[in-house]
Amino acid sequence: MTQLEIPASDKQHTNAMNNQQLYERARQLIPGGTQLLSKRPEMFAPDVWPAYYREAKGCEIVDLDGRRFVDMSTNCVGACLLGYANEHVNQAVQQRVQSGSMCTLNSPDEVELAELLVELHPWADMVRYARAGGEALSIAVRIARAATRRDQIAFCGYHGWSDWYLAANLSGEVLGEHLLAGLDPAGVPRGLDGTVFPFQYGDLDALREIVRNNTPAAIVMEPLRQRYPEPGFLEGVRQLADESGTVLVIDEVSSGWKFHCGGAHMKLGIEPDMAVFAKTISNGYPMSAVIGRSHVMDAAQTSFISSTYWTDGIGPAAAIATIRQMQQNDVPAHLESMGARAMKKWTELGQQYDVPAQAASLPAMSALKFDHPQQLMMHTLFTSRMLDRGYLAGSGFFPTLAHTEQHVDGFIDAAGEVFTEIRDAIANDDLESRLKTPVRQTGFQRLT
């Protein structure tokens, strides 16, 4: 029997396993245990974090063991702004499934969605689709390279797992400064070294230097993440792109529709050459879109960009329904309100209990942290104890339309009980001894 073969006696039925048993099995069958790094239990509280769900509705989750939680974490990394299993989106998807989600012909929803996206973004003329953020960004980079006949890319921020992006780490650990540390470029061709050039958000001089000394096909950047830009920064980026004939690509995969119906770039007054959407555009169903100006997007016809499941009917149906709901509800205002409420009360709680609690970033993508040398232990203890109180909690809170003031206040009340223990643990210097689980991980690490 080879190493990869599984004895028949070990092939247990997954529906008979609890959360921890199933995750241990997953680690044997799936490299890394999960498909998304941010869903690894090791990123929260190893051995106690519920890896699997049975039901998810609104902002509540029932795990595989039947326990009910209010999700006060990142809510699937902000993918479901309307809340889990939104009835309007689900109804549109169910209608498409019943009518057939895939066949030899194309779904007319592709055209309706394209019309809707171009209507929302007057600067854009054309649309291409994919089903995930990383691949949509790769499409945008391919189109930019085809349009300019150039190879190099300037970027800032986090842009996924693709070769074009991870090539930045072939010369050293530079991507750790752009959100996620530990991104080893194993498997990325060494020939891509020197094709991508990172710059820090807000550092216009660094970008100017890149453009002066190289010939980038595109500037790829998030419009914002942890803070709003300083006056003149985005305008300066736009000017540099225009002067150098470089395609400006705005990555809205994370910022998405959280700050404005149509994307953060619209709130900030910047008109790119291309914008990329995923996650929030379809409220939990696989869908992504690249929109852009016709003189750039036309280049997609000169390069082979094609895939069968980019034509399924579910993604466009979900996206149309999601966008319609966002047009009818002021989602950004609600996210701002709920996030700001949580950040304010988190900071006040820290002051009340003399715990080094710190709220950072923007309300729609808030970070609720501990400013302490043992902050990883604190977070692990906090997450473990909040599970006992019926809350999924990590180091960030991405609110949804389903969250109410009652959800936020209930979370803060429960956190106050846990802060009492954290305060005592700091005073007694016994944080580690209180943990019944390994300390949480940060960044990308191999699971042994």
Per-range role (PLM):
Residues A340-K344, G350-T383, P399, S433-T448:
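Conserved PLP-binding catalytic core of the aspartate aminotransferase-like
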Residues I323-K344:
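Structural signature of PLP-dependent enzymes
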Residues N15-E55:
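Active-site-adjacent loop/helix segments that line or gate small-molecule/cofactor pockets in enzymes
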Residues D203, E209, M221-V247:
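Active-site core of PLP-dependent enzymes with the aminotransferase class I/II
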Residues A114-A218, A340-M343:
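PLP-dependent aspartate aminotransferase-fold enzymes
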Residues Q327-N329, S337, D388-T448:
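PLP-dependent enzyme catalytic core of the Aspartate aminotransferase-like
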Residues R68-R149:
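Glycine-rich loop-to-alpha-helix module at the N-terminal edge of alpha/beta enzyme cores
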Residues I270-A299, T311-A318:
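Active-site PLP attachment segment
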